[in-house]
Curated annotation (Swiss-Prot):
Gene (UniProt): pfkA
GO cellular component: 6-phosphofructokinase complex
Function: Catalyzes the phosphorylation of D-fructose 6-phosphate to fructose 1,6-bisphosphate by ATP, the first committing step of glycolysis.
Family named by the database record: Belongs to the phosphofructokinase type A (PFKA) family. ATP-dependent PFK group I subfamily. Prokaryotic clade 'B1' sub-subfamily.
Binding residue positions for ATP: 12, 73-74, 103-106
Pathway listed: Carbohydrate degradation; glycolysis; D-glyceraldehyde 3-phosphate and glycerone phosphate from D-glucose: step 3/4
This protein's UniProt keywords: Allosteric enzyme, ATP-binding, Cytoplasm, Glycolysis, Kinase, Magnesium, Metal-binding, Nucleotide-binding, Transferase
Gene3D superfamilies tied to this protein: 3.40.50.450, Phosphofructokinase domain
Molecular function via GO: 6-phosphofructokinase activity; AMP binding; ATP binding; fructose-6-phosphate binding; identical protein binding; metal ion binding; monosaccharide binding
Binding site for ADP: 22-26, 55-60, 156, 187-189, 213, 215-217
PROSITE patterns recorded: PHOSPHOFRUCTOKINASE
Species: Haemophilus influenzae (strain 86-028NP)
Name the UniProt record assigns to this protein: ATP-dependent 6-phosphofructokinase
EC number: 2.7.1.11
Residues bound to Mg(2+): 104
């Protein structure tokens, strides 16, 4: 029977992480468990930055963006000796289980602690990219989506005033859920997704045809890392004769107060993680599918499960362009 659990946030921050921490802490305390916060992710664990938390430690955090526990990239965790030391530190505090909030990289760390050291871990999907398998939505995605749509709305105001073409680069790496969803909600004329091969010439020809039909301005939503958007803007302007500007939303998408959906999702997932650990179920990750909370073997989720590309959403977006 577990008596003490710890929680950490790892990788890129996401709105709603604080709500998830709160869900873990207060649910665990309600079950008579002691809870410890690990500051600055796996790096903080390695440096023994561990502090006991109480219910007041998570007061007034549900509405705050970021993560009050802090986060950090820690590639050194790939070293088996580093992981062994981390497991030893956890046990030196009498900690019986760990909740990890983050993306795929964070899950991998939890997987290795479970596999190599038999340490019960539960992963919660915390990333704005929505690129974690086994869940329809990740914590932070809906808030980041609203941030992107708000930016697109503002860009449309100025683009329409100046008959300008605006390119908006949206986060997501190899997952275009944010781009596709923001493109639909923002009424973008063109959406460029990372899952589909990017054809610059085809895009420019589409814009040229739109201008011939009388289009006076346009918004192009594109997933990051596909191309240099500033170079693309110059090429479009030279070819079509319309002023073209690129805006990189960047890390602004990670900040801000989490929306109601993310606060509720994170709170539910945090409580669910504690329930799993109380049932003796370590080595799992939590997701939401068809509005129901679910859990998957974390090893299976990393090695075998594939995130579902929203091809039907992109098809709708293309029809609405």
């Amino acid at each position: 029977m577990i008596k003490k659990i710890a929680v950490l946030t790892s990788g890129g921050d996401a709105p709603g992480m604080n709500a998830a921490i709160r869900g873990v802490v207060r649910s665990a305390l309600a079950e008579g468990l002691e809870v410890f916060g690990i500051y600055d992710g796996y790096q903080g664990l390695y440096n023994n930055k561990i502090k006991q938390l109480n219910r007041y430690s998570v007061s007034d955090v549900i509405n705050r963006g970021g993560t009050f526990l802090g986060s950090a990239r820690f590639p050194e965790f790939k070293d088996p000796n580093v992981r062994a030391k981390c497991a030893e530190i956890l046990r030196s505090h009498g900690i019986d289980a760990l909740v990890v909030i983050g993306g795929d990289g964070s899950y991998m760390g939890a997987k290795l602690l479970t596999e190599e050291h038999g340490f019960p871990c539960v992963g919660l999907p915390g990333t704005i990219d929505n690129d974690v398998a086994g869940t329809d939505y990740t914590i932070g995605y809906q808030t980041a989506l609203q941030t992107a749509v708000d930016a697109i709305d503002r860009l449309r105001d100025t683009s329409s005033s100046h008959q300008r073409i605006s390119i908006v680069e949206i986060m997501g790496r190899h997952c275009s859920d944010l781009t596709i969803s923001a493109g639909i909600a923002g009424g973008c004329e063109y959406i460029v997704a990372s899952e589909i091969e990017f054809n610059r010439e085809e895009l420019i020809q589409q814009i040229e045809r739109s201008i011939i039909r009388g289009k006076r301005h346009a918004i192009i939503a594109i997933t990051e890392l596909l191309t240099d958007v500033h170079s693309l803007a110059k090429e479009i302007e030279a070819r079509v004769g319309h002023e073209t500007r690129a805006t990189v939303l960047g890390h602004i998408q990670r900040g801000g107060s989490p929306c109601a959906f993310d606060r509720i999702l994170a709170s539910r997932m945090g409580a669910y993680a504690v329930d799993l650990l109380l049932q003796g179920k370590g080595g799992y990750c939590v997701g939401i599918q068809n509005e129901q909370l679910v859990h998957h073997d974390i090893i299976d989720a990393i090695n075998n499960m594939q995130r579902v590309f929203k091809a039907d959403w992109l098809k709708v977006a293309k029809r609405l362009e």
